[in-house]
Amino acid sequence: MKKADAIWTKDFIMVLLVNLFVFVFFYTFLTVLPIYTLQELGGTESQGGLLISLFLLSAIITRPFSGAIVERFGKKRMAIVSMALFALSSFLYMPIHNFSLLLGLRFFQGIWFSILTTVTGAIAADIIPAKRRGEGLGYFAMSMNLAMAIGPFLGLNLMRVVSFPVFFTAFALFMVAGLLVSFLIKVPQSKDSGTTVFRFAFSDMFEKGALKIATVGLFISFCYSTVTSYLSVFAKSVDLSDISGYFFVCFAVTMMIARPFTGKLFDKVGPGIVIYPSILIFSVGLCMLSFTHSGLMLLLSGAVIGLGYGSIVPCMQTLAIQKSPAHRSGFATATFFTFFDSGIAVGSYVFGLFVASAGFSAIYLTAGLFVLIALLLYTWSQKKPAEAEGKVSIAE
C-alpha cells in the first residue's frame, strides 16, 4: 500500500486519541454527576438529569454554528482553543459546591464540547485519504464506542475508591493530557481557508432530507436517556453499584460485535431488516432493566440494549446521509445528531421529573414500551424517500 493511502498515520492516531479523551470524559461525567448531585450536593434525581440536559442543550444550540466557526477560524486553532477551554474549565468542578454554579459550568462546557467534537471529525476527514475515507471514519467512530465502555467503567470504579475532589482532579488532568496531544496534530493547510461567512439560513444549519429519520432518532434517544442519565443511580438503588460499570462494558462489546454484521445486512437487504428488529431488541433490553435485581440481569440487560441500540443508530445516521444530496452529507450528519442530542437532553429532564415518585422500574418499563412507537415513526419516515445523490455504506 502506498504511504499516501495509509490511514494509520501519526496525525490520524493523534486526532483519534483527542476524540477518545473527550468522549471518555463525556461518558464518565454522564454517569457520575447524577450520583455526585445526590451524595454531595443533596440534590434530587431530576437535578442530576438537569446537569446532563443543560450540557447537551448548550451543545445542541452551538452545533448548527460550530461547522462555520471551525472553518472560519481554522481547524488546528479551534482544536487547541476548544480543548484548552474544555480542559481548564474541568478544574472548576472541585471548588464548585453550588448547584446553580455547576449548571453554569455544564452549559459552558457543552459549548466547547460541540465545537471540539465537530473539529475532530473534520480534521479526521481531512487526514484520511479520499479513497479510504469510509473505512477511516469507521475506525474514527469506534473511538466513541470504546469511550462508551471505558468512561462509565472507569468513573464508577474510581468513584468508589477516591473522594470526589481527587476524582475531579484526575479527570481534569486527563483532559490536559488530551490538550497536549492536540498540539501534535498537523492539519492539511489547504483545508483551513478561513473564508467561511456566517449565515443563519435554515439550509446552512439543517438538511431537509434528513429531518424525518432524525425525528425517529430523537425518539430513540429520548428513551435511551434513561440509560445514560440514570443507570448508575438505579444500580445504586438496587445495591448493584459494584458491577454497574460492567453494564457499559457489556453494552459496548455487543454493540461493536453487531456493527459489521448489521452493516452488511443493511447494504444487501435494506435498512428495515436491521432497524425493525433492533427497535424490538432495544425495547426488550429496557424492559429487562425494569425487572433487574441481580448482577447477572443487569449485565444481560446491558448486552441486549447494546445489541439493539447499537444497531439502530449507525443505520439511521446512514439513512440521513442517503436521503440527502451527496454534497450535503455533513449537514445531514449534523442534523441527525442535533435531533439525537435533543432527545437525550429532553429525556434526561422529563424522566427525572417522574423517577422520584414513580421509581426506576417504572421509568425503564415506560421507556421500553414507549420506544415501540418508533416502529410506526420509522415506517412513516420511509413512505416518501427522497432521492439521494449518493449512497454510503455502513458495512465498512
Swiss-Prot record:
Membrane topology classification: Multi-pass membrane protein
Membrane-spanning ranges: 12-32, 50-70, 85-105, 110-130, 136-156, 165-185, 213-233, 238-258, 269-289, 296-316, 336-356, 358-378
Superkingdom of this protein's organism: Bacteria
Family note: Belongs to the major facilitator superfamily.
GO molecular function: transmembrane transporter activity
Main localization of the protein described in the UniProt heading: membrane
Subcellular location: Cell membrane
Cited Gene3D superfamilies: MFS general substrate transporter like domains
The keyword Transmembrane appears for this protein: yes
PANTHER family associated with the record: PERMEASE (PTHR23531:SF2), QUINOLENE RESISTANCE PROTEIN NORA (PTHR23531)
UniProt keyword terms in alphabetical order: Cell membrane, Membrane, Transmembrane, Transmembrane helix, Transport
GO (cellular component) term, any one: plasma membrane
Name assigned to this protein: Uncharacterized MFS-type transporter YwoG
Family annotation (SUPFAM superfamilies): MFS general substrate transporter
A family per Pfam: MFS_1
